Amino acid sequence: MALPFQKGLEKYKNIDEDELLGKLSEEELKQLENVLDDLDPESATLPAGFRQKDQTQKAATGPFDREHLLMYLEKEALEQKDREDFVPFTGEKKGRVFIPKEKPVETRKEEKVTLDPELEEALASASDTELYDLAAVLGVHNLLNNPKFDEETTNGEGRKGPVRNVVKGEKAKPVFEEPPNPTNVEASLQQMKANDPSLQEVNLNNIKNIPIPTLKEFAKSLETNTHVKKFSLAATRSNDPVALAFAEMLKVNKTLKSLNVESNFITGTGILALVEALRENDTLTEIKIDNQRQQLGTAVEMEIAQMLEENSRILKFGYQFTKQGPRTRVAAAITKNNDLVRKKRVEGDRR
């Protein structure tokens, strides 16, 4: 299917350009030349000899044959002799040849070592085995690995064979893998829902297969639980939805004192939710949020520092700050909170 503008070009396909140019007058040809110059000022499509316009309107005074001119210039160049050098080149070398200086070879002179008479007598009367043991203590490995010394010890009286340099290493202590977390997830969840007084600490660390809905149920059950004081879910693949659920729990819970969510997949959004929830919590004294999959960023760290400066109950905060400013502010805030606790304890002891 032809486009509308293509249909209009069909009639120009069979036009003879030479016939059209032959019908144009000199003025029309000049106008056409000016139009072409405007379209292509550099005349990149023309040979170099035709790009410049004629600078005069005068007629030529004689015939011009380009081939004849080139032949004449080539003939003149071959017939003209080269100019001789004013100073002919003789190949003579001038100056001195560079010879690098040889560095003197340093020869080491062995120093004569004089021993005490008692040591000389002891070494003179020592057996080969004693000398071998002494070399091992002093670290003289050349003597220990010398085959000539082995032959001498073999030929000695009372020796059954050569003494080899066998160094016995210490036995490697077996490093056993940590046993899996023995916590029964379902049983702990049911105890929390039943508000069991015997359950005061829940440790779910390193249990990788806990579903996200189950972790949310733990957070939901903590809202009404009045006995659990320490809850830890480090390295459980928890993410932002879990962090948001625990943030809602912190706004309601009045018993929990320690929360650990380290080594998880929580981003800055989840951490900020937990930090904001601490403004409405009066019982939590310890929270750990370090070693997440991605860095929290400067903005989140500044929010954490501002919250801790306004919170007088957090005594332990587990996070390694990347910036000096928030780190200094948080350290000062935690120190201030611990000083307040110490002052209250001292005042209570005085009473």
UniProtKB/Swiss-Prot annotation:
<keyword id="KW-0963">Cytoplasm</keyword>
<dbReference type="Pfam" id="PF03250">
    <property type="entry name" value="Tropomodulin"/>
</dbReference>
<dbReference type="GO" id="GO:0007270">
    <property type="term" value="P:neuron-neuron synaptic transmission"/>
</dbReference>
<dbReference type="InterPro" id="IPR004934">
    <property type="entry name" value="TMOD"/>
</dbReference>
<dbReference type="GO" id="GO:0005737">
    <property type="term" value="C:cytoplasm"/>
</dbReference>
<protein>
    <recommendedName>
        <fullName>Tropomodulin-2</fullName>
    </recommendedName>
</protein>
<dbReference type="GO" id="GO:0045745">
    <property type="term" value="P:positive regulation of G protein-coupled receptor signaling pathway"/>
</dbReference>
<dbReference type="GO" id="GO:0007611">
    <property type="term" value="P:learning or memory"/>
</dbReference>
<comment type="similarity">
    <text>Belongs to the tropomodulin family.</text>
</comment>
<dbReference type="InterPro" id="IPR032675">
    <property type="entry name" value="LRR_dom_sf"/>
</dbReference>
<comment type="subunit">
    <text>Binds to the N-terminus of tropomyosin and to actin.</text>
</comment>
<keyword id="KW-0009">Actin-binding</keyword>
<dbReference type="GO" id="GO:0005523">
    <property type="term" value="F:tropomyosin binding"/>
</dbReference>
<dbReference type="GO" id="GO:0045202">
    <property type="term" value="C:synapse"/>
</dbReference>
<feature type="modified residue" description="Phosphoserine">
    <location>
        <position position="25"/>
    </location>
</feature>
<dbReference type="GO" id="GO:0003779">
    <property type="term" value="F:actin binding"/>
</dbReference>
<dbReference type="GO" id="GO:0005856">
    <property type="term" value="C:cytoskeleton"/>
</dbReference>
<keyword id="KW-0206">Cytoskeleton</keyword>
<dbReference type="GO" id="GO:0051694">
    <property type="term" value="P:pointed-end actin filament capping"/>
</dbReference>
<comment type="function">
    <text>Blocks the elongation and depolymerization of the actin filaments at the pointed end. The Tmod/TM complex contributes to the formation of the short actin protofilament, which in turn defines the geometry of the membrane skeleton.</text>
</comment>
<keyword id="KW-0597">Phosphoprotein</keyword>
